[in-house]
Amino acid sequence: MPNWGGGNKCGACGRTVYHAEEVQCDGRSFHRCCFLCMVCRKNLDSTTVAIHDAEVYCKSCYGKKYGPKGYGYGQGAGTLNMDRGERLGIKPESSPSPHRPTTNPNTSKFAQKFGGAEKCSRCGDSVYAAEKVIGAGKPWHKNCFRCAKCGKSLESTTLTEKEGEIYCKGCYAKNFGPKGFGYGQGAGALVHAQ
């Protein structure tokens, strides 16, 4: 007997999933809005899902719950924290002295080799290779690589730097260039500064 208008059942909520809202994973169907990590409830897709015993997790929560435990394992220096996994049902090991993260600020070679990331000079968030621009010798997100005054998008050849901030050449000249008669933005904007 044909199934007129029906669909598969959602692996999370059990209701009917119609084709337009269906996400398939591990032979099961889910509503897009139900395809969430079992722990943190983040939305998942084919690049972020990890499956264990018919349960779906984001890769981060899966690694915390089922990944290798101990010193030296983890997700890279950019995501270290002191969470020991109690909320995931992991019982902490009793040890006389817990491991402490390093305080050595020189992590660039480690970060390049093991997947950590440098920090953006504007917003302070991690900058990964796909979004990294180098300007004034420092890393920036492509979206943060803008003039600090006017917000104009910059290129490494069109920027000027002062005290750790980057500016377009026009804003740099207006704000930090020479002042007085004969200096400025051209004959139409001459001023006399005292």
UniProtKB/Swiss-Prot annotation:
Q: Polar residues compositional bias: what residue ranges?
A: 94-110
Q: What does this protein do?
A: Interacts with zyxin. May be a component of a signal transduction pathway that mediates adhesion-stimulated changes in gene expression. Totally down-regulated in transformed cells.
Q: Where in the cell is it found?
A: Nucleus
Q: One Pfam family name from the record?
A: LIM
The ranges of region (Disordered) come to 85-110
Residue ranges constituting the LIM zinc-binding domain according to the UniProt record: 10-61, 120-171
Please report, in chain numbering, the residue ranges of the motif Nuclear localization signal: 64-69
* Sorted UniProt keywords: Developmental protein, Differentiation, LIM domain, Metal-binding, Nucleus, Repeat, Zinc
Return the GO cellular component terms, semicolon-separated: nucleus; Z disc
In its UniProt record, a GO molecular function of this protein is: actinin binding
* Keyword check for Zinc: yes
Q: What is the name listed in the Swiss-Prot or TrEMBL entry for this protein?
A: Cysteine and glycine-rich protein 2
Q: Which organism is it from?
A: Coturnix japonica
- GO terms classed as biological process: muscle tissue development; sarcomere organization
